[in-house]
C-alpha cells in the first residue's frame, strides 16, 4: 500500500465515532517510530476530552500531541528532521487545513490525518471530503451499530438519550455519553418540529 517512490503523500483515516480512527493513527505513528523515523502529532485545542497534550483513543491508547488553535500554527512546529506529520480530529480544523496538508506533502512529508467524514446529521464534515479527494490513500473505517449490530458508518448524537435534531449545533465535543455509532438504517435525525 505504501510503495511510493517519491517522498511526500497524504493518508486519510475516516469513519464514524468509535470506528478506531485515532487508534489507527496512533498505530501508524508508532510503526514509523519503530523504523527510526521522526513523527510529530497534532490535535485541535478543542479536543480535550481525555487529555490536553495527547491523542487518546477510546480504548486508552495514546501518543503525545501538540495542541494547536489554527491550521497554520502547525508550520511553527515542523523541523527538517521530521518524516511524518500526523493530525487527529482533522474535522475540527479551520479551512486552511487543506492547504497546510498539501504544502506539507509537497515538501516531502508523509501526512496522516484522521477525522469524522460525516457530522451527526450524516452530512460531509468540515474539510475531510476535500482531504479525501487529494489524498493518495483513504482508509474508511466502520464501527458496529449500537442499535442492531450492523456495520456503522454514521455517528448518532444523543441528548438525554434521544436523537439530536438536524438543526442542533454541529460541533459538540463529547464521548460515549453523547454519541454512538449507527448504521444507515438505525441513524435518526429528526427536525425540531418532529420532536
Curated annotation (Swiss-Prot):
Q: Tell me the protein family, please.
A: Belongs to the thymidine kinase family.
Q: Where on this chain does Zn(2+) bind?
A: 145, 148, 183, 186
The GO terms describing molecular function are: ATP binding; thymidine kinase activity; zinc ion binding
Question: Where, subcellularly, is it found?
Answer: Cytoplasm
Any idea of its EC number? 2.7.1.21
Q: Which residues form the signal peptide?
A: none
Q: Write out the catalytic residues in the record.
A: 89 (proton acceptor)
Please state what the protein is called: Thymidine kinase
The positions annotated for binding ATP are 15-22, 88-91
Pfam families, A to Z: TK
Checking InterPro entries in the record gives: P-loop_NTPase, Thymidine_kinase, Thymidine_kinase_CS
Describe the subunit structure: Homotetramer.
In terms of Gene3D superfamilies, this protein maps to:
3.30.60.20, P-loop containing nucleotide triphosphate hydrolases
User: Which GO terms of the cellular component aspect does the record hold?
Assistant: cytosol
Q: Could you mention a single GO BP entry for this protein? A: DNA biosynthetic process
The chemistry this enzyme catalyses reads: thymidine + ATP = dTMP + ADP + H(+)
Keywords from the named record: ATP-binding, Cytoplasm, DNA synthesis, Kinase, Metal-binding, Nucleotide-binding, Transferase, Zinc
